[in-house]
Amino acid sequence: MNSAPKRKLIETSLPLEAINDASVREKSIRHGHPSTLHLYWARRPLATARAVLFAQLVDDPASRPEEFPTAEAQDTERARLHELMERLVKWENSNDAELFNQAREEIRKSNEGELPAVLDPFAGGGSIPLEAQRLGLEAHASDLNPLAVLIDKALIEIPPKFFSSPPVYPGTAEERTEWVRAEGLAADVREYGRWIRDEAERRIGHLYPKVTAPGGTEHTVIAWIWARTVRSPNPANPIETPLVRSWWLSKKKGKEAWVRAAVENGKVRYEVVHSADGPTGDDEGTVGRKGGLAIGDGTAISLNYIREQGRAQKLGEHLIAIVAEGPKGRIYISPNEVHEEAFNVELPSNVPMGDLPKNPRDFKTPNYGMSKWSDLFTNRQLVALTTLSDLVGEAREKILADALAAGTPEGERLEKGDTGAAAYADAVATYLALAVSRTTDYSSSLCSWHNTGEKMRNVFARQAIPMVWDFAEANPLSSSTGSYLGQLEWVAKAVERVPA
């Protein structure tokens, strides 16, 4: 006859304050956190997942009276386990081998000397199976969402296959004597990612010219600030009007900058002004929730009219400012013809042309004629993203060749569960593709410029596709906010820290 199951620690008490504090603090930890590998909704805090798994698998002292016969002895042991949990949930201790060995021993004591397997059938962003793996448990995960499956494979399945493997990029393995966890994998992600960026610049760099400041110095562009435009409904003055939420480029104290728009010869001219004395209130922009106002004469433009013009494919865009890398931070420069002309490129042939869902609550752009996936990007962005995507496949071939040259047998592909050169090339290419996908979140015409933080704001700030009037087009070939190299570094740092 089987004995009754023992009461677990989670059924009695938990150090909730420590768990809550660690979970809240996780939100401010960015570089190296697994959540930065790729965006996914409603990720569970790692500290909570780790604590709950441990407390579910470890017996409460009261269920082991042969070891802890008195209430006092049980309280003392419970306090010891709580102290261990308080150390376990701290982010700084995530890769403390000695601490996690102690945790594994406690789990073994409560499970007949074994480390049990853990299954999360709806793993989502992978917090539970990832922390199960960190605790030394056999982790199994599944999900209905293919993105979740890919993220979970990249966090949980791939790194252990190449545990402590040195990188294969020529000359990199010799940089240190020992490669721990997935550090070698992360090093190759960086090196082949930089190759992708450099090759992309060679192919499409002419589409991203440097900008000349008023003093004559050249600077790398971080972002181009655009405003969508609509023809004024006033027949006496049918000017092409910019639709702008805010003319402000920077509200940072001492670095204030904004755009002044003026009508000259029936056209709008834009000038960057460096002054704290900028537009306020109703003058801060030209469009709001109820519609817009025409530049010059102030003609009211209803939201319905803007939507009609959008569905008739009559919305345009004006370049209103350029953000560039300066010697002491961001600099803001007035637009010019060189950068307007660089924007005018042909739509590439191999872009996703599917229709957006008909869901006006969460997908706002079809109301304005942007009903296909490709409509959410400028042509230049589509050229950049298709180029980067194509280069991931080319990078895989380079990785395979370099791995073979390093003496690794070719073996089967990663999907077959192998760990040879072919599987390794697949693994690195997976992370490179995730970096391109992250770049997409910062490379659409639905991104905006954060004028207090002086940085790009991504599309998925919330779980919806909004309509954005004045949008920021990041330079994917720069090394600044919204660039491919920036997204690559987020991925590489996440890979470095995952348990392998």
Regions found by a protein language model. Give the residues of each.
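Nucleic-acid modification enzymes, centered on SAM-dependent nucleic-acid methyltransferases
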Residues: 2-119, 129, 133-500
